Each structure stands twice: as C-alpha cells, then as structure tokens.
Amino acid sequence: MSSIRFIACLYLISIFGNCHEDPYYQPFNKLNITLDIYTYEDLVPYTVDNDTTSFVKIYFKKFWITVMTKWCAPFIDTVSVYTSHDNLNIEFYTRDEYDTQSEDKICTIDVKARCNHLTKPEVTVQKEAYRYSLSSDLSCFDSIDLDIDLIETNSTDTTVLKSYELMLPKRAKSIHN
C-alpha cells in the first residue's frame, strides 16, 4: 500500500509541484454519471455487465459503452438505461452509502463509446487534470454528452459539490438557452 501512495505522491508532484495539496480534491461520497447519446443505431436489445467495483459495460447491437472508475471510494452500484427513438440516456450512480473520497487517492472516471465498425478517428475530451475523460470514434453517434456529479450526502442533506460536462463532438454551449 505504501508503494501506491509513493507513486501517487510522485504523480502529484509531477502535476501540482507537491503531494500534499490537490487543488481538485472534493470530499465526495456519491457519484452520478449521466450519458446522453444521439445515434441512428438500434438501441434495443442491450446487455449490462457491471462488476460494481470498477467498470460497467453496456453492449448494444452495433456499439458498446464502457465506464471505468479507478481509485474512487464510491462505486457505481446502479445503472438505468432509457431509450427513445434516436436518444439513449444512461445513468450510472451510487445509491448505497460509501466512504468519503480520500485526498491521497485520485479518483478517475473514463467513459468510452465504441462503434463496431470504425470510420472515424477516436476523439477524447478531458477535465480536471485528466481525471475525467470521454472518448469515442463517433462513427455511429451524432453526439455524446457526459455529466459527472460529485456528491456529498449525510443524514440530513445531499449536496452536489462539483459538476463536470464533457461533450463530443466538442462544441461551444449556446448562450441563448
């Protein structure tokens, strides 16, 4: 365990200059990840493979989605899939109570959407010093929107501490919303 902390400290030193203060640290104990995909491919049937510790994979007829978490105290223990014509909405979230994220472990979330037949190069967008990433080749998708919420919950309150939005293709938000 001490070797992992040493490596994490070296990583923090290389990025932030020291291993004691992480400017992106949030003391969250729940995750909420929402993925909106617009595609012309069939959205049913699908199968879900969830190990409830570090990954969730969802397989569709012509594409698949993988959500990988690394060194996160809260786990994705619930997956909800909603389909409507060309819109796919998937929620990955923490329903149960977990420990608060430790400052000495950097939680990373990596979401990949892959088409069975690649016709375009892979594109990746990232936030917060590469902690959160979304990648896809966009061969069978019109667009992908990913929202990540870091949540703190206790016996009396639930608070969203930080939210991140990643989009493919990368585009500017409309100021007229």
Curated annotation (Swiss-Prot):
UniProt keyword annotations, A-Z: Early protein, Signal
Signal sequence bounds: 1-21
Disulfide bonds: none
Keyword presence, Signal: yes
Pfam families: CrmD_SECRET
TM region(s), chain numbering: none
Domain of life of the native organism: Viruses
Keyword Signal: yes
Family under the similarity heading: Belongs to the poxviridae C8 protein family.
Name recorded for this polypeptide: Protein C8
Taxonomic source organism: Vaccinia virus (strain Western Reserve) (VACV)
